[in-house]
């Protein structure tokens, strides 16, 4: 693990009366690489996904103000009521229309969250995904951080491929489980004792598993051995993470005062507080350089949304109907969908503002953090014309303050993902079904 050094210790703390607080970035804390020479602060990438689509109203509709899309286009666009929470951040965002994944056209309306960052499944039998864009970036940006990436999800775990609880998939197309509980996320990021215990448990389980599979392998036929080999390939990924974690055990965790965070909240008792504390933890993870890549799925696409975390969002926004129905009825009751989506955007704007208010040398964390916010549905779960917002990343060359509309079904969203990947200094020529980069963004 690289040894990071600063002119002042980066993880310097104020101590007193039993409280420990991590200091913010100070001018004396200039970045340096592992050889001690001056280096630019790191780039970061975060994707946030919301389920069930939007009120997809045309500009000629009398109720267009309650739709998702801005009115007008280019630099003269006007915010809809739905997007108004982002108005103070206008010069930091680019709403996008017309992009989607052609590979998702034939999937059911509830089946595309898992391909949002992958561009499409790997096989026609719909059993294997591709690597997600965040993991391509994490392989590059995550080399010098304690955690290669963070995977957050209101549901936790992985779900099913066509009903995913995670946005992140590894090189083999295997899902990476999301963390749902704020307290668990905090302990993972900042709890040194917890990290040691977790590592011991994981290592013990892995050792027993590998021993058992070695004994089993000799008893299996050829077909079963192939299946077992595929499984063990995934297990080796876990083994590599354990080796990685061991390399960081003697490096102190960044220390953050838990008393400043509402870790006890949950989605049911306080949806707004839940979203904000997850965003707080993502902010702290970036600020302390614990990771440089993160994803956050704010609800899966289960049709029975009363069993999904997404059930909490309409209630918090003052909408009586459950999440799934709100979006199915968005054409006839766009006001409800607007309040629902504006509530989620209000919390995303809170995250953006925290990043914007945090200075890092001659820029801000937001300038060096590329954010992608969106859904893989438009109206009534149609898998076309995704509602997308690109934000931040001005130090990476992104130019905001405009609304870009691309021709329908002509430009794959993979072009956006390729643009992001390349701007984050990852050397790739293509991603999924990309046909090029979006030069309009830079």
Which stretches of residues belong to each language-model region?
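Ligand-binding pockets and gating/stacking loops
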Residues: 1-442
């Amino acid at each position: 693990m690289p040894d990071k050094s600063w002119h002042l210790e980066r993880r310097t703390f104020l101590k007193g009366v039993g409280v420990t607080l991590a200091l913010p970035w100070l001018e004396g804390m200039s970045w340096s690489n592992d050889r001690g020479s001056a280096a630019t602060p790191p780039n970061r990438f975060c994707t946030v996904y919301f389920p069930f689509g939007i009120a997809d109203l045309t500009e000629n509709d009398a109720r267009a103000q309650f739709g998702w899309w801005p009115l007008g286009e280019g630099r003269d666009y006007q915010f809809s009521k739905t997007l108004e929470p982002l108005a103070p951040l206008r010069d930091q965002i680019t709403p996008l229309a017309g992009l989607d994944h052609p590979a998702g056209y034939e999937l059911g309306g509830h089946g595309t969250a898992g391909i949002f960052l992958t561009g499409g499944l790997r096989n026609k039998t719909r059993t294997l995904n591709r690597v997600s864009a965040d993991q391509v970036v994490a392989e590059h940006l995550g080399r010098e951080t304690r955690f290669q990436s963070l995977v957050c999800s209101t549901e936790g775990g992985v779900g099913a491929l066509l009903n995913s609880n995670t946005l992140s998939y590894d090189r083999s197309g295997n899902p990476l489980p999301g963390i749902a509980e704020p307290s668990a996320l905090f302990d993972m990021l900042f709890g040194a004792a917890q990290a040691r215990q977790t590592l011991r448990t994981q290592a013990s389980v892995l050792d027993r598993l590998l021993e058992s599979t070695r004994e089993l392998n000799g008893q299996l036929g050829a077909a079963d051995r192939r299946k077992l080999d595929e499984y063990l390939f995934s297990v080796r990924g876990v083994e590599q993470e354990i080796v990685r974690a061991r390399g960081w055990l003697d490096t102190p965790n960044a220390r953050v005062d838990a008393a400043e965070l509402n870790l006890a909240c949950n989605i049911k008792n306080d949806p707004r507080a839940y979203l904000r504390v997850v965003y707080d933890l993502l902010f702290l993870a970036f600020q302390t350089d614990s990771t440089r890549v993160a994803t956050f799925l704010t609800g899966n696409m289960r049709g029975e949304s009363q069993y999904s975390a997404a059930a909490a969002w309409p209630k918090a926004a003052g909408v009586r109907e459950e999440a799934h129905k709100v979006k199915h009825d968005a054409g006839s009751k766009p006001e409800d969908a607007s309040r629902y989506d504006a509530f989620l955007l209000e919390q995303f704007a809170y995250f953006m503002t925290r990043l914007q208010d945090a200075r890092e040398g001659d820029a801000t964390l937001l300038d060096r953090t590329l954010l992608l916010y969106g859904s893989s549905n438009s109206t009534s779960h149609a898998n076309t014309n995704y509602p997308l917002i690109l934000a931040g990343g001005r130090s990476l060359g992104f130019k905001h303050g405009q609304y870009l509309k691309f021709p329908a079904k002509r430009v794959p969203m993979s072009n956006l993902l390729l643009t992001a990947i390349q701007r984050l200094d990852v050397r790739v020529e293509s991603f999924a079904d990309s046909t090029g980069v979006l030069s309009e963004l830079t």
